[in-house]
Amino acid sequence: FAVMLERANAGGRNGTALYARRLLALLGIGLAHALLVWSGDILLTYALLGFVLLLCFRRTPVSRLPKWGVALFVLPLLLTFAMAGFATLAAQDPQAAAEFQKGMAAQAQQIAALADGERLAVGAGSYADAVAQRATDTGAMLGFLVFFAPTLLGVFLFGAWFMRSGTIRDSAAHLPLFRRLRNIGFGIGLPLMLWSAWTHPTMSF
């Protein structure tokens, strides 16, 4: 997105208008793919978040982009810790624990109902049934957007900073930064992934 805006503006065109038109096209393609082929299509999400970037961060100073990126990227992690803390506290109160388990069970039932509906529509229904089910699934997926959208927005803002700051255009002059990012990424990400694979080798859906 940042590359498109920068190039359009540098060429004397209205980058915002071009950006909006292409986002609308991406939204249409993503919606068609989600309804006609697969409800988990990421293009629809990218288009919606692209409009958020356009409306909220188009005029953000370059120096603030990585700060916003970090804040949005870690927000879901903080929410996860908060939910884990709430679950721990709830477990100490029998009534609260029962309510928490009731809510989790209801959510599990909703997910199971979606999965059963998808199997029935795709496995035994008509193509129209499958499209209708994918519409339901797409709506449910968008309902979870609030949980993972901040992470994606954070990544987008990092990318915008790399472009608008000139770091990508003159990568040779910023090799120390790239090496530092590589070392931090491997130093934190690899141990976490190994720990995750060790503690949760499989997941049940």
Where are these regions (language model features)?
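Membrane helical hairpin/interfacial module
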Residues: 1-43
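Specific transmembrane alpha-helix
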Residues: 1-3, 44-57, 147-170
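Small-polar-interrupted transmembrane alpha-helices in polytopic inner-membrane proteins
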Residues: 18-35, 71-75, 182-193
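Hydrophobic alpha-helical membrane segments of integral membrane proteins
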Residues: 35-52, 63-71
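Membrane-interfacial entry segments at the cytosolic side of transmembrane helices
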Residues: 61-71, 176-183
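Long hydrophobic alpha-helical segments that form multi-pass transmembrane helix bundles
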Residues: 71-150, 154
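Membrane-water interface at loop-to-transmembrane-helix junctions
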Residues: 138-146, 172-185
